[in-house]
Structure formats: structure tokens, C-alpha cells
């Protein structure tokens, strides 16, 4: 017996698609959950704002990012000055990131 459930939640500007799968084999139940993020149909301005928030959250997971003073290491591929918008009210400022080159491409 295989039961497949789909749950879709709209989180602008992306659609968060979560699939729940229940598999029963010889009276044993196996539960699986898959999550996929797809682009939604919101405006480009909202998408950009959301991407910046995502990047901030992603960078916050890395120890090189201190959240206040920029990044503590100077390893951003071949360049020493990397830029990122810290909040919607700030301007683009030079920042130094340890793993920026590997994080940013998936949000562009």
C-alpha cells in the first residue's frame, strides 16, 4: 500500500511544495517527507527582497558571518570586496565573506 499526500503552501514569492509519502510493507509503516521550493508568480521587486532575506539567513548559519560587523574572513573567490544588501533600508556596502561564492549562486 502506498499513500501519497501533497501539501502546497504559498510563501511569496516562492511556492513551498511538501509531499508526504506513507509506505506500508508487511505491517511496517515508512514515512517520508520531501520539500521543494518553486518560483511563484509574484513581482520581481518582492522576489529580490525575498532572495536578500534568504541570503542573510543562509549566511547567518556560517560562523564567518557575525551579523553586525560584516564577515570576519577575507576569502571571496578572486575578489576581496563582496557586496550584499543587509536590510531593505540600507545601501549596498562592501562585505567580506568566507563562503559567499558558494552560497549566492543558488539565490540568483
Curated annotation (Swiss-Prot):
UniProt main location, coarse: membrane
Domain of life: Eukaryota
Residue ranges of the TM segments: 10-32
A GO cellular component annotation in the UniProt record: membrane
Keyword Transmembrane: yes
Note: Partially overlaps RRN5.
Protein name: Putative uncharacterized protein YLR140W
Keywords carried by this UniProt record: Membrane, Transmembrane, Transmembrane helix
Subcellular location: Membrane
Membrane topology: Single-pass membrane protein
Amino acid at each position: 500500500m502506498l499513500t501519497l499526500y501533497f501539501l502546497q503552501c504559498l510563501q511569496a514569492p516562492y511556492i513551498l511544495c511538501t509531499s508526504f509519502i506513507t509506505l506500508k510493507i508487511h505491517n511496517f509503516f515508512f514515512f517520508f517527507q520531501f520539500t521543494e521550493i518553486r518560483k511563484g508568480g509574484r513581482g520581481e521587486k518582492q522576489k529580490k527582497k525575498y532572495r536578500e532575506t534568504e541570503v542573510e539567513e543562509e549566511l547567518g548559519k556560517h560562523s564567518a558571518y557575525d551579523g553586525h560587523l560584516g564577515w570576519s574572513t577575507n576569502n571571496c573567490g578572486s575578489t576581496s570586496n563582496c557586496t550584499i544588501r543587509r536590510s531593505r533600508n540600507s545601501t549596498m556596502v562592501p562585505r567580506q565573506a568566507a563562503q559567499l561564492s558558494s552560497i549566492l549562486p543558488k539565490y540568483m
